[in-house]
Amino acid sequence: DISAVAKMLKLKIPVSVSREFSGDFDVFAFGGNSFDQDECAKAKNTAETCYGPRIGLAIMVLDPKKASSALRIWEKTMSSDLKPLILAKAGGSATANFQTGTYQSQSIRYKNMPINTITVEYALSDDILIITTSKSAILKAIDSLPAQSIQETTPATEPAQ
């Protein structure tokens, strides 16, 4: 049960998001790579936590449109709510708001932390929600998706403020 795992990891996932979870999920680890290690070296950060392992979640969702809308609203607190997934001392955010990027026609929402090897990122591909704590980890997770899951997606519109 993803709710039990979230509780065990001390993650705060809003009910508006978790009610869209189907129950099928995976927790995975990305071991880091030389790109991240080089980026940390440029920033004069030699701590292994700067470039080391990252934890991610892959969660099946019931209704991708509802999940997308709920995720956009969650962005306001997502970084702090998922802080236990970040295995490094990241400090505050480098960007005030989430931004959108694209990889293999897949829309990715992300928020950078002070070091660009540490982020909070998510992508919704068909009915699979991927949440990671580094750019490298989400790209690797997208590469691992079945080919039919990778399709051009349009992010939900910003909720009214």
Residue locations for each model-derived region?
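Non-transmembrane interaction and regulatory regions of membrane-associated proteins
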Residues: F28, F98, S144-A147
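A short, solvent-exposed beta-edge/loop patch
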Residues: Q106-P146
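Extracellular glycan/ECM-engagement signal in secreted proteins
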Residues: L139-D143, A147-A160
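Intrinsically disordered, low-complexity regions enriched in small/polar residues
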Residues: G23, V27-G32, T100, S105, ...
